[in-house]
Design a protein with these regions (language model features):
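N-terminal redox-cofactor-binding region of secreted/periplasmic oxidoreductases
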Residues: 1-173
Length: 173
């Protein structure tokens, strides 16, 4: 992994008053395969508004979220959350995902064990608390065009291993 190298954009937030003016980092890869190479395989898309701005910058009406989502969906073979994961709060929007692409995307049981995701009441309690105390919206699916809030994040970790997007595409050639 390239977390602590110049292969990481390492974006930093402005100081956050609610956490004592600390800043937080967002890892993003400068590699073929992008962030799947350095961030543990988190599978997130930008907000719809960010994609729609491309339409204005390029003067191309097809460079908006609605049109680009078709191509983003082609990259993934989404695996919906299991019954256990749904009970713990994981959810998704069917139209926000593809189901026949080269990348296995879902709520991996391996990541669940390593990161203790979906393994107790803590996850749901956290989301409920930040919504109640801070007004942070709970998101059904962070890849549906609105990622302003908090929710469970799918990963590019399949049943047995983490796979960077570059590897999946290069294996097909």
């Amino acid at each position: 992994e390239f977390v602590d190298t110049d292969m990481n954009w390492n974006f930093e937030t402005v100081p956050q008053a609610i956490i004592g003016n600390q800043t937080k980092s967002l890892r993003a890869g400068k590699t073929l395969g992008g962030s799947t190479s350095i961030n543990g395989g988190a599978w997130n898309r930008a907000h719809k508004v960010q994609y729609d701005m491309l339409k204005n910058i390029t003067s191309d009406p097809t460079f908006d979220f609605e049109h680009l989502q078709e191509y983003m969906n082609r990259a993934e073979s989404f695996v919906p959350p299991t019954k256990e994961q749904r009970k713990a709060g994981a959810d998704y929007v069917r139209e926000a995902h593809g189901y026949d692409g080269p990348l296995s995307i879902g709520f991996s049981p391996i990541r669940n064990k390593q990161k203790r995701m979906f393994t107790g009441e803590g996850q749901q309690a956290f989301l409920e608390t930040i919504q109640r105390v801070l007004g942070v919206a709970h998101l059904k699916d962070q890849n549906s065009g609105n990622n302003t809030g908090a929710g469970w994040t799918p990963t590019s970790i399949s049943q047995d291993s983490k796979r960077e997007s570059a590897c999946r595409y290069l294996e097909q050639t």
